[in-house]
UniProtKB/Swiss-Prot annotation:
Cellular compartment(s): Secreted, Cell wall
Protein name: 52 kDa cell wall protein
UniProtKB keywords: Cell wall, Secreted
Chief site of localization: secreted
Presence of the UniProt keyword Secreted in the record: yes
Gene Ontology CC terms, in alphabetical order: extracellular region
Length: 10
């Protein structure tokens, strides 16, 4: 199971 990835680098 993978943790919810929350990457916001715009």
């Amino acid at each position: 199971a993978q943790p919810p990835q929350q990457a916001d680098f715009l």
